[in-house]
A protein has these predicted regions:
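Catalytic alpha/beta core domains of metabolic enzymes, predominantly
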Residues: 167-175, 182-301
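Glycine-centered loop/turn motif at secondary-structure junctions
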Residues: 75, 111, 134-141, 201, ...
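Bacterial N-terminal signal peptides
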Residues: 18-27
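Structured C-terminal cap/extension of enzyme domains
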Residues: 62, 245-375
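A general structural signal for well-ordered alpha-helical segments in protein cores
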Residues: 100, 126, 130, 194, ...
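Short, Lys/Arg-enriched N-terminal segments with co-localized hydrophobic residues
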Residues: 1-10
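Boundary at the C-terminal end of the N-terminal hydrophobic targeting segment
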Residues: 30-34
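Active-site beta->alpha loop and helix N-cap motifs at the rims of alpha/beta catalytic domains
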Residues: 35-188
Length: 375
């Protein structure tokens, strides 16, 4: 340093720049940059958690945190909350914020991407959710955090979807998975729109949960995967009913589904895929998964008999669900309208429970043998 004409101290400009850069990098770390997952980490099975409730219908945040750890410890590279239709629509904003915090705290230091739902009845509400997720990331810099977003409920055109997600891309510091299905009233975003947004906001976009109906999902997936590198990962949806085909032939490198009770077998499928298996080794793991989710004479839906397995691993303490007052429950999820809900309880008989116990053991034994064989 040297003195100026007025006796003040003049810093060496190189040192000033060095200090400024150090301060800037420190600020980035504090602001949640450490929590930003890489594109490579945004691949594989990302199960959506089923929200656990107490008997009175209030959210069981302790069990929610345990559920996130169950998925992470099972080997899945990511876990999602809250993104099921009923969770998006029937939880209050305050309940979502509290759940975000519980999951982020539970996954501190774990090698699993916590992907939180940035959704809303309109763009403004979606931005509120995304802004809170960024705040959660600041408070938990050692938790890898991403977002997932479906089109806001009030959009009715491609231009409106683009405008909404463009606003989201401008405020997000982290990857965002586009969910192509919103509600029965929102249009499916065009593939060209998804590519355009990925090119415009490459730090955030380029991840797609493809949810077109039936065979159309495969056709769109091929188009999306052909648009790499702006498009980075295309996740299968709808329970993974076509995931084997999509892994082998359509370029899918991930799955988003509310099947977190089966996290161990989903992780095993992915491990086999990652080590290059494309034949019977991959098919048999997928067949085990399909067996587990296809007990058709049991209480169905994504919150049907799966809740029993979540209770079994300590990720849930009841069989209670919030349900739309006018709900239509299918294997694809719970569908309804509005924010009013009722409580329902999934009931199983002794024989059903006995078989689920056997199936759970089958899954865990299969996964254990798979890990041993890979050594």
């Amino acid at each position: 340093m040297r003195k100026g004409k007025r006796g003040g101290m003049i810093m060496n400009p190189v040192k000033v720049f060095s200090v400024a850069v150090t301060s800037f990098l420190a600020a980035l770390s504090v602001s949640g940059q450490d929590s930003v997952p890489s594109p490579h980490e945004m691949r594989g099975p990302f199960p959506i958690m089923s929200t656990p409730y107490f008997e009175d219908g209030s959210v069981d945040y302790e069990s929610l945190a345990k559920e996130s750890v169950w998925v992470a410890d099972s080997g899945c590279p990511g876990v999602i909350w809250c993104q099921s239709n009923d969770a998006i629509d029937l939880l209050s904003i305050e309940e979502k914020f509290k759940g975000f915090e519980a999951c982020a705290a539970a996954l501190e230091g774990r090698n699993c991407v916590l992907t939180l739902g940035a959704n809303g009845t309109n763009t403004a509400e979606m931005i509120v959710m995304a802004s809170e997720i960024e705040q959660v990331a600041k408070r938990h810099p050692h938790t890898k955090i991403a977002m997932i977003s479906r089109p806001p409920d009030d959009v009715r055109s491609q231009d409106e979807i683009e405008s909404a997600w463009d606003a989201l891309g401008k405020i997000s510091k982290r990857p965002i998975i586009f969910q192509t299905y919103g509600t029965k009233s929102t249009p499916t975003p065009d593939v060209k729109l998804l590519i355009r947004l990925a090119e415009r906001h490459p730090h955030a976009f380029g991840y797609v949960k493809e949810e077109a109906a039936g065979w159309g999902a495969n056709e769109r997936m091929l188009q999306e995967c052909a648009a790499k590198p702006p498009i980075k990962t295309v996740f299968a949806g709808w329970g993974g009913w076509q995931w084997l085909l999509q892994l082998r032939h359509c370029g899918s490198q991930g799955l988003v589904t509310e099947r977190c009770a089966y996290a161990p077998i989903l992780a095993e499928i992915w491990r086999r895929y990652e080590r290059g298996e494309r034949g019977v080794e991959l098919a048999e793991a997928y067949a085990m998964y399909r067996l587990l989710i296809d007990q058709r004479n049991f209480p169905g839906g994504l919150r049907g008999y799966s809740l029993y397995l979540l209770n079994k691993v300590g990720a849930c303490r009841s069989m209670v669900s919030r349900q739309y007052e006018d709900a239509k429950v299918t294997e694809g999820g719970s569908f309804g309208a509005g924010r009013k809900w009722k409580l329902t309880t999934t009931k199983l008989n002794d024989l059903q429970k006995k078989e689920l116990d056997c199936l759970f053991k089958d899954m865990m034994d299969f996964v254990s043998k798979g890990k041993t064989a890979a050594l």
